[in-house]
Amino acid sequence: MTMQTFALTPGRLNKFKGEILAHAKPYEVLAKAGRQVKMPQNMSDTYVARRFLPYGATSAQPNIFFPTATGDRGNVIVQAHVTQEGVTPAPDSIVPVDITEVVVQYSCLYGFSDKTFNLYEDDIPEQMKIQIGERVGLVNEMIVYGKLKSCTNQFYGGAGTSRATVAGPMVLNLQRAVVRSLMANHALPVTKLLAAAAKYDTSAVAPGYFCYTHSDLEGQIRDLPNFTPAEKYATGTPQEGEIGKCERFRYILSPDLPSFQDAGAAVASWTGSGTGYSTTGVNLDVYPMIVMGADAFSQIAVRGVDSLDPTFLPPGEKSKSDPLGQRGYAGTSWWKATMIENQLWMSVINVARQA
């Protein structure tokens, strides 16, 4: 661990000391979505969500009421409920499905010397506090992103059947295939997101299937037929990072949803216009596009004072490990988990892009 010493950060003496300049800040888009759960303390490290399968559904197809079969599948359900006079029907039972996620502890910590704290021209500890908040936001976004990328309902661009065979861009037919899958599984459009405040409150949004992906894909998304830019919405306020909608999709972009570099098919396999993009020029970069309906996943949000355990220890506090009180620290720890509650109420589209 590197301690922030007086010499580590060059000063600005004998120069006009300007403002502390703005720096890059992480986007938070996925962490505003999903069902927000606040798990009480001392209740275990394991979060268990439960649902009951509806009539006609199975564990393999928990959202579909009509099994694959020939004939009039709707009439099969009707006939199963015809009651004979004087005959008590056989009782049915309902089947629970439990989904489990273990909550994990995360932390970040900065250190600084007493000389930096007492003599340095800038308030280094204050800047550390600011960056702690931003760093927590970035880590949380990556926690959610990492979990959602593991969704089992995967689609691939350019006739691909795996990430390693992705060879094409996002196209309208691919979007429509995802919509068919979501609607067949009774995935409802998203209608609310976490409010932009340090709370668990939600705010209403215009309904749609929200699609989150990297800002590199903006050009090809805007080129989709039937695309409507966010600035031309008749009603409603676009979300942060939202560039527009195409049919049932609302597209939200962030530079903090990174691609899988060189993970796709060979560049020569590219099926789109021009040349496909590759970091090294060998295999196409693959961009996950996270598409979700309402209540597809849940997360223990890092919002509210109970979710973070901040630390600020200024120099001067003497202990056996620091007998002269020469070191100070600023940091925080927190607990978080992200759970996909219904794999088929969301999907991941894996695509490449044009160079």
Give, region by region, the residue ranges found by the protein language model.
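Exposed beta-sheet edge/beta-hairpin loop segments within beta-rich domains
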Residues: 117-127, 203, 315-324, 338
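N-terminal "assembly arms/tails" that initiate or stabilize quaternary assembly
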Residues: 1-101, 346, 350-353
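Alpha-helical scaffold segments that mediate packing/assembly in large oligomeric complexes
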Residues: 116-195
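Short acidic, glycine/tyrosine-flanked loop/strand segments centered on an H-E-D-like triad
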Residues: 91-120, 296-311
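Structured, hydrophobic secondary-structure cores that serve as assembly/anchoring elements
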Residues: 104-106, 110-120, 195-223
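Sequence/fold signature of self-assembling virion shell proteins
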Residues: 2-33, 165-195, 208-212, 216-355
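Extracytoplasmic
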Residues: 44, 105, 206, 325-327
